[in-house]
UniProtKB/Swiss-Prot annotation:
All residue ranges annotated as the PCI domain in the record: 325-505
Cross-referenced Gene3D superfamilies: 1.25.40.860, UVR domain
Biased composition (Polar residues): 875-887, 895-906
InterPro entries for this protein: EIF3A, eIF3a_PCI_TPR-like, PCI_dom
Keywords assigned: Coiled coil, Cytoplasm, Initiation factor, Protein biosynthesis, RNA-binding
Stated name of the protein: Eukaryotic translation initiation factor 3 subunit A
UniProt keyword Disulfide bond, yes or no: no
One Pfam assignment: PCI
Subunit description: Component of the eukaryotic translation initiation factor 3 (eIF-3) complex.
GO process terms (BP): formation of cytoplasmic translation initiation complex; translation reinitiation
Main location: cytoplasm
Summary of the function given for this chain in its UniProt record: RNA-binding component of the eukaryotic translation initiation factor 3 (eIF-3) complex, which is involved in protein synthesis of a specialized repertoire of mRNAs and, together with other initiation factors, stimulates binding of mRNA and methionyl-tRNAi to the 40S ribosome. The eIF-3 complex specifically targets and initiates translation of a subset of mRNAs involved in cell proliferation.
Region feature Disordered, mapped onto this chain: 570-606, 793-1052
Organism: Monosiga brevicollis (Choanoflagellate)
Amino acid sequence: MSMNKFFQPKNALKRAEDLEAVGKPNLALETLHDLLNSSKHKKQWTAVHEEIMIKFLDLCMQLKRAPEAKDGLYQFKIVTGTSAVNSLEKVVRYYLKTAEDKVAEAWQQSQLRDATNVNDEIDDLEEAQTPEQVLLAAVSADGETERANRVQLMPWLRYLWEAYRAVLELLRHHSKMEHAYHATARQAMRFCHQYERRNEFRRLCNMLSLHLNQWRTPYQSKSGQAGIDINNPQTIQYSLDTRFELISYAGKLEQWQEAFRAMEEVTGLLDSAPEKPSPPVWGIYYHKLAQIFWRSKDYAFHAAAWHQMFDNAIRNAKSFNRDDIQYAASAVLLASLTVPLANLDTMVKPMEGYLPEVRASRQQRLAGLLGLSRMPSRDELLQYMFDLNVMTYVHPALKDLYNLVEDEFDPLQLSQKAAPVLEFLKSHEQFAQYVTPLKYILLLRLLKQLSQLYSSLKLERCFKLASFMTPEECEEVLVHAVQDKVLQLRIDHARGSLHFNNNIFAFNERQVNDGPKLQNLQAEMMNGQLTTLSRRLYTAINMIKPAVVQESQMGVKAINRIKDEVAREHVSNLSRRDEIEKQKEELEQSRRRRHQEQMQKHHQNQMQVRQKMAEAVKKNQEELERQKLQLQREEIERQKALEALNDVSSSSAGQKVVQALNKSDLGTKITAQDIHKMAYEQQKKDARERQERLRAEEKRLDHMERAKRLREIPRRKEHIAAMSEQNAKWHTELQSARLEKARVDHAKALGLKELLKAFAPDKDAYIEEKTAERRKEYMAKLDDFKQRMQEQKIRLEREERERKREEKRRAEEEEQRRIKQEEEDRKQREREAKREQERQEQLKLEEAERKKMEEATKLQRQREEQVRAREQEKLSNLSAQTSQPTWKRSARSDAPTTAAPSSMRVSSWKGDASDDSGRSQPFRPSRGGERDSGRSFSGLGDRGDRAPRDTGRSFSGLGDRGDRAPRDTGRSFSGLGDRAPRDFSGRSEPSRSGPRDFSGRSEAGRTSGERRALHVPSGGADKPSGDNVWRSSRGAGSERRVNIPSRGDDKN
């Protein structure tokens, strides 16, 4: 939407309010944004601009449009300039206050307000959420409430952070808004601390550092406004206060690297200050330095910072009270005493992991912050402490601490004497940090003193003497002290003892201040034994023969003088030779240097000549190029001027300009801008002339109207007088007519009243009668209504009882259905379990039967093998005998036949061999003679004139089996061996299609037809029907079939 139609800013504001009222905040925001960007309304600030800006910021906050808000603030800064700084400050404060209120409201509504790990939700407010984070949030275990809180709170946190950044960038070069800039920086620090935004705090520190570096460079805006002057004392004080606040919040957020950088900036500000900072400023500076050094475990620099602070407090006692001085003195004492004797791992490893060069550079930087040239030692700090007379100002409870640690030799009572001091330190929060390092120092002093009294000591007693530390801490300190060569001892855990090493060959301890000594150790005395002996012998000789000693001394002195003179002359000769060589080298070097200088000078001259020639050529080319460009620019300007002349000639003012111009000056003296300017001036001139003409016409008309009015005044007065007289006459006549009419009406009413008085009793009686009837009807209706209400109440109560009874019945039926369903489910599960159990039992039975069949098959095969062996034996016995036929077929005798002997006749039911003479045949029916079956049972003779039917097997035990392999049916039909009985005891007959059970029938009860029908037919025989087939398992995957015809089917 174009803003050209808004000639006044208040119209745009009203339009935006109307759009917001109808639910179109986006259009309202665009309206105000276009107005702020319009150059037409940036010339002069008005109060309406402030209202527009506040409404604009409200819309940006409603829509969470931080970039638009930032751009609007920049445009408003241009509008305000230097004349309305208070308005800009008011708008900025309103913007930040509203954003902070929104965040606080979202924080209160969010259920994450009790958590301090908001940083775990979104690590960086400036980074967009990645697809991986979106997917992870979708599948995370957070509930809907946590996700809703995150969505509700985090956008406002991001918006507030963007607001802080925008305001700081806006005010960084505004000298009149410097106090607002630093106030905003402190607000941003509180925001980072309140919501645990560590990443944003680091960005804030980088931003403030960048702005400070930019202030060191002179800056001037496009409008001519000067930037912030870093040399201004007020600016320095603002910056120092902001940095000190930054260091405090950095400590709370554990951002000590940022605190150290801020401290370096503070050092630079103090050094560059034109005026000397006040003593309280130095006190704050040294106190912050001491905190940083303690956190970085630079205990020596920490103590040095407290020394500097105490010195500042003493030299400026008027600026500090007595409690501050006492606190500083106590801190100096504790910091100096707790400086480690060595870099024990359990105490401090400040330089671990640093290269020597880096370590030296770091120490130099830290010393520079305190104005020192190097890192002070522990002894120097203690000596400086006495130079400052610190012990006079320390707390009374700490006055004996120095003597306890450095002077007294009482190892057995050291723990008891140190206990009150340690308790005092623990009870005061400002001194509690010194408890642990002080324990380490006390333990080392205790062990040093014990090493002078004992060569070995029980660990239990040692731990008891060091009761201010746990045994584990004591042992850890011992190990690291031996590792760093502070102590000479060893721990024997097997015997639970501590051995102090007094061996003369042991390593030398570090040269540290050992504190009080009772006597030197044996190792120390042995190390200096020869020196002591020499000194004492010299003293004895001097006492016995002083003259000899003096002569000896004089001789020694003369020899020493001669040696010194010889050495001096030798050195002089060597130096003279070296001097000659040095002079030769200097002469040679001077000659070479002069030659090189001449060559360099010649080369430089040539280079200068070439450079001058190149510059001249380049200058000529540039001049030609400049002239060419000038001609091109003039031609372009001339074309633009002609186009502008054509544009403006369409108006009357433009035509006047065209007539007044000299076209030869186009493009040189007169440009297109000049033409437009002249046309604009001519338009303004014409407009002024029109205004003058209009004003003259207005003046003429005013005079004419005034003259007319003056001539009309007398006539208007006469007309008014005549109208007044006529109106009075009309009023009198109307009043008289109204009164006469009222008198007549009153008389008529009185007559009517007298006439109606006779009807008054009848009227009263009629009213009473109607009233009684209406009352009676009302009472009847009331009784009827009460009766109907009572009946309805009874009916409702009855319906309620029925409803409750129906609900109860439905509940009981539902409960019965549920119980019945549960019972049916239980029975169904029992039936299924029973069927499963029966199926398992059936499987077990079938498995057992299969195993029995396999065993029977195996036994049958063994018996068949035995039968074959016996057949072979009988065959060998009968091979020499001559066979005689015993029976033949009666019809045909073409081929000789032989009858089987009685001893080898085969039963048609089973394959048992029987003797006709000695045994009856219970399974064979009694017959008069042998039945011709068409085949021979003799295995020794010919088969007769009729070929036996090929059934795929042989029934003779002596002949060949034919051209087909016998079919294994699980039984033997040979008459020479025993038969393996089949086991049918375990089979049942559930249906006609299953196997039949023969276990209930005896062999004698079977008919001959049944016995003959149990043979196994060949593959070419007719297949038996399904009901008469008996299947049995002979092995894995095998099957045999036996046709069992009915009793009437025996025809063969």
